[in-house]
Amino acid sequence: MHILRLATSTIVLLFWGVIAAAQPGADDTWWPSEWGTDDERGAANRLGSDKVLEAVALIREGRIYELGRDYEAGMPIFPGRHYSLTIPGSPTHGPMGENQLVGHDELVSAQIGQVGTQFDGLGHIGTRIDGEDRFYNGFKRREFGTPYGLGRLGVEKVGPILTRGILIDVAAYKGVDRLAVGEVISADDLRNALARQGTGIREGDVVLIHTGHGRLWMVDNDEYNSGGPGIGMGAARWLADQKIVMTAADTWAVEVIPGEDPDMAFPVHQELLVRHG
């Protein structure tokens, strides 16, 4: 089996993985950002040395939990996406030198959106308003979008992330192994699950949501890809009000699919990424 292990932060994933009106108008704006008109970092601005020290002080046993997925042939991939890994000759190099060195290289072809573990940067999602595509902090797509990379809102602007992580086990709160595809997680669900765990959210935290949907990975890929449980708009807005840095889930979308409103396309992505960074 061809498997590629990619190094990922344990808290920036969307496989373990954000409501605007149907026709937004010019008065429906979310900019400038609270961090200034030129800000491209978004909610990561909530992270400072105090938050890092707070997170490090929580370590007691030094255990490491790997949340990323293996990139491998046959994994569930969002329709239209692609992933392949090949070894161009075995060995790719050598033998070389008197010591007869041999080696392998990998050739990877892929789209990173909805392929394995991923992180949605702020240039991923925007909203069209009166013919103008606007992203986080009101940046206009026509001024930074190119076929060879984004001139603004790249993930490199976010910077390193070391902070306190909170796992909200919604599946355990509801007494099931796995929430159903299309099951909406409400703000009350999150609050009640946190109360059950005796856990609270602090500004600058990362929130991980366990639905059990990840159990389907490489077991029933068709069901995994068919949709998923996830947060609805109420939960998304509540999380934003808690001033978190980011959220993640063991689903491919984080938000509920099919969505609460069949006429809306990924509104939770718009709420969290575009409006709240």
What is the meaning of each model-derived region?
Residues M1-L4:
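N-terminal secretory signal peptides that target proteins for export/translocation
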Residues A7-V18:
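Bacterial N-terminal signal peptides
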Residues A22-G277:
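Active-/binding-site microenvironments in catalytic and ligand-binding cores
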